[in-house]
């Protein structure tokens, strides 16, 4: 699997090689995940500086939007069926191993009408929790 390159104009160092490697390893271990995106806030910076630092669908360096910030600030996950109807997108708070909130992880899972959405959320939470165990702190990514 190839690492996504930062887009033209992205901030220098926007893509974290460590985060990208962790993301790619996670996708290999979880083929049920169609996409995975990690939004992380650099240590000591305001949450409005939260940005995508690892992804298998591009957008590296993209700043958090209002939805991302809402999840980050409230700690409540959000879900949506994709416009094409074949993917269930789950966005969850992303924690480090000390359970400190460091950002948001978005996980896309295959979906068809009638699928158990609660089970898909549990799958996404399991993937997120496996990531958490491998992240000592957000500083590891910067």
Language-model region placement:
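Juxtadomain coupling helices with adjacent low-complexity linkers
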Residues: 12-20, 24-25, 109-142
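Flexible loop/coil segments at beta-strand boundaries within sensory signal-transduction domains
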Residues: 95-100
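Amphipathic coiled-coil signal-relay and dimerization helices
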Residues: 44-58
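Short glycine-/small-residue motifs
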Residues: 103-104
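Extracytoplasmic/periplasmic sensor domains and loops in membrane signaling proteins
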Residues: 54-80, 122-126
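Boundary at the C-terminal end of the N-terminal hydrophobic targeting segment
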Residues: 3-4, 8-10
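A short beta-strand signature within small-molecule sensing/ligand-binding domains used
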Residues: 85-93
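Short N-terminal helix-loop-first-beta-strand/juxtamembrane motif that initiates sensory/input modules
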Residues: 24-46, 141
């Amino acid at each position: 699997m190839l690492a996504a390159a930062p887009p033209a104009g992205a901030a220098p160092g926007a893509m974290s090689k460590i985060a990208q490697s962790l993301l790619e390893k996670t996708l290999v271990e979880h083929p049920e995940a169609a996409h995975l995106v990690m939004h992380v806030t650099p240590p000591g910076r305001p949450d409005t500086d939260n940005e995508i630092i690892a992804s298998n669908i591009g957008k590296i360096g993209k700043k958090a939007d209002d939805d991302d910030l809402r999840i980050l600030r409230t700690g409540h996950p959000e879900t949506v069926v994709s416009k094409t109807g074949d993917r269930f997108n789950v966005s969850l708070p992303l924690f480090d191993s000390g359970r400190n909130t460091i950002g948001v992880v978005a996980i896309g899972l295959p979906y068809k009408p009638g699928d158990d959405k609660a089970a898909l959320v549990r799958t996404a939470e399991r993937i997120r929790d496996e990531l958490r165990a491998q992240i000592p702190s957000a500083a590891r990514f910067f």
